[in-house]
A protein has these predicted regions:
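An alpha-helical appendage that flanks or caps ligand/catalytic pockets
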Residues: 2-62, 99-205
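A generic secondary-structure micro-motif detector
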Residues: 70-71, 193
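A local structural motif
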Residues: 63-70
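Hydrophobic faces of well-ordered beta-strands that scaffold small-molecule active sites
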Residues: 71-74, 89-93, 124-131
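A conserved active-site cap/scaffold subdomain adjacent to cofactor or substrate pockets
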Residues: 74-105
Length: 206
């Protein structure tokens, strides 16, 4: 609810000359705020002229794009993917495997198509982040960047666990600690573009 209301406020600020908002989490402008500024003459556009309280506020400068810049939301679960599509928000995905991404791409396509009442092409409105390191050989990529990538993912997965790295329906063997399986070989085949130019190109086409 907080995110949805934040988005509502943002769109108002971008698209209206002066705006007000009274919601569950936010109220703009602050109630009964008296406005007095020598360089900003009073105006009924944004003030109650009887008591000099603000009725509306504005932002400057306004966005260059009309009605506003494209909005992108980082998503993971199907619920957030469908919510973004239903609100005509582009999405950004990161860690999931190709098999998992295909399900997520389809979910976004279907929800966006339903919202716009047309067939939205698969992949439209979706951005994908992938970690990449290109080298002359596969061994060189591993030697120069592999350890750093694993350490980075250990930091990320400390809270998240390994669920985002798994294929749909995949079961991982039980381990003493939740990140015992997290190594270069585990990551590389799932979502890393580390290797020769040819390898990276093939993975992109995948």
């Amino acid at each position: 609810r907080l995110f949805a209301e934040t988005l509502e406020v943002l769109k108002k600020a971008w698209t209206e000359k002066f705006f007000s908002h009274a919601g569950e989490f936010y109220t703009y402008p602050h109630p009964n705020h008296v406005w007095q500024h020598d360089m900003s003459p009073p105006s009924e556009e944004f003030m109650n002229m009887k008591d000099n309280t603000l009725k509306k506020i504005s932002i400057v400068p306004k966005p260059y794009q009309s009605p506003h810049p494209p909005i992108h939301q980082v998503v993971d679960g199907i619920r957030s993917i469908e919510w973004a599509a239903q609100n005509e928000i582009n999405v950004i995905m990161w860690i999931p495997t190709v098999k998992a991404l295909k399900i997520k791409f389809e979910a976004y396509k279907n929800a966006r198509s339903e919202k716009e009442k047309k067939n939205v092409p698969l992949g439209e409105g979706v951005s994908l982040v992938r970690d990449m390191f290109v080298a002359d050989t596969m061994e060189e990529a591993r030697e120069k960047a592999g350890e750093h990538m694993v350490n980075y993912m250990k930091w990320v997965c400390h809270w998240r666990g390994l669920g985002n790295h798994m294929d749909p329906g995949e079961d991982l063997p039980e381990t003493k600690r939740k990140l015992d399986l997290l190594n270069y070989d585990f990551l590389h085949k799932r979502n890393m573009l580390f290797g020769t130019p040819e390898y990276v190109i093939d993975k992109i086409h995948e």
